[in-house]
Amino acid sequence: QLLLVGRFFQAAAVELGHKNFHTFSVGFDDGGYFSELPFARQVAEHVGAQYHEVVIDQKQFIDTLPDVVYASDEPLADLSLVPLLALSRLARKDVKVVLSGEGSDEILAGYDFDRSERDYARARFLKGFPNNALKIGAAFSRLGLSEGLQRKAEKVANVPLGDWNRIELPHITSHFNQGEKEKLWPNEGHQNSERIIAEQYAAAKSTDPLQQMLSVYQQSWLVEDLLMKADKSTMAASLEARTPFLDYRMVEWANRQQNNVKVKRVGFNNYETKSVLRRFCERRLPNEIINRPKRGFPSPGNHWMQNGLDGWARETLLSSEGKLGEVFSREEMEGSIEQARLGKGDSGDRVWMLIILEMWLQVWDVSLLL
């Protein structure tokens, strides 16, 4: 027996296989954007699978964090580990082996790779203008662009095409830039995270920006986050996880394909991600499943931080028993928590990274003091 979560390509796998399947889904009691349970029920009903679900509230989420930190072995600050562990525990009651869709986005260009391809096409277009014209705001005004689009166009116009990817994926390394690291942990050496990604770009065999991005995602995000958390969460529940999209033959085939097989232009300014997979599924699944916007595996952690959880974050990070406070700037951590409460930028992600690191130090009784 197998587990498949409710994305359209996995629903297609059930459709093509036998009907003795269990499907499992996890959601949050906040509902709305953070719960895909109605969609998961629709998929299960369509394919005739046995459906199971689990709902997590804020207290269960917080109470599960130490288990997640312990199961991860290392400080892996991805909050989707919590619902993944809950899902794995639910599935283990009925199955021993699970199938997961990790890798499909990284080899077939899911996520926002349509936006990346579109923006790169715009950059090529803008490069056709003389540089002096690109730097004149009046030229953009005559084109009818908004002030925001003018600023973006000017930025794009002044980035060499060969360096395009450097402005596209800074989040793949860390939510802390070098300056923020130095403020948080002053008077210490810091690993330059951007250099790691720059080296992976330089090592990419293709000179095409989309192919380069996919290569970097396959080497970093896929290996160091997605597969890590899938492996840790399922092992913690005594499950065996398999990833059919990462069969070496599938990966090699996908990496040989042209861009338009993965990201297809479907209008003047619209692109379709994972196009080849959608074509395969459209004869087998309803359009509302195939064309539903991708959400990934969202967690309401940042939403909760803006709605009362900031007090718990302060207690966790700033108490006298805290280990991070031994070396990290308490002022900077306090500032990040306040920014997270206000929903500013990616400050919520930074706070959760600090919380996971603090919990990891506590669970494994590690001190940052030498």
Which residues make up each language-model segment?
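Adenosyl-5′-phosphate
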Residues: 49, 80, 93, 97-99, ...
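Active-site adenylate/phosphate-handling loop in enzymes that bind or generate adenylated species
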Residues: 85-148, 227-250
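Active-site proximal loops enriched in glycine and acidic residues that flank catalytic Cys/His/Asp
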Residues: 25-27, 55, 102, 237-238, ...
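Phosphate/oxyanion-binding loops and surfaces in catalytic or ligand/nucleic-acid-binding neighborhoods
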Residues: 16, 46, 105, 114-117, ...
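Cysteine-dependent PTP/DSP-like catalytic domain, specifically the C-terminal lobe
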Residues: 2-86, 90-93, 97
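Short aromatic-enriched loop/helix-cap "lid" or pocket-rim segments at secondary-structure transitions
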Residues: 35-37, 65-66, 109-114, 304
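Short, polar/flexible loop-turn hinges at active-site or ligand-entry regions and domain interfaces
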Residues: 52, 74-77, 119-127, 260-267
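Extreme N-terminus nucleophile/cap motif
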Residues: 4, 8, 13, 126, ...
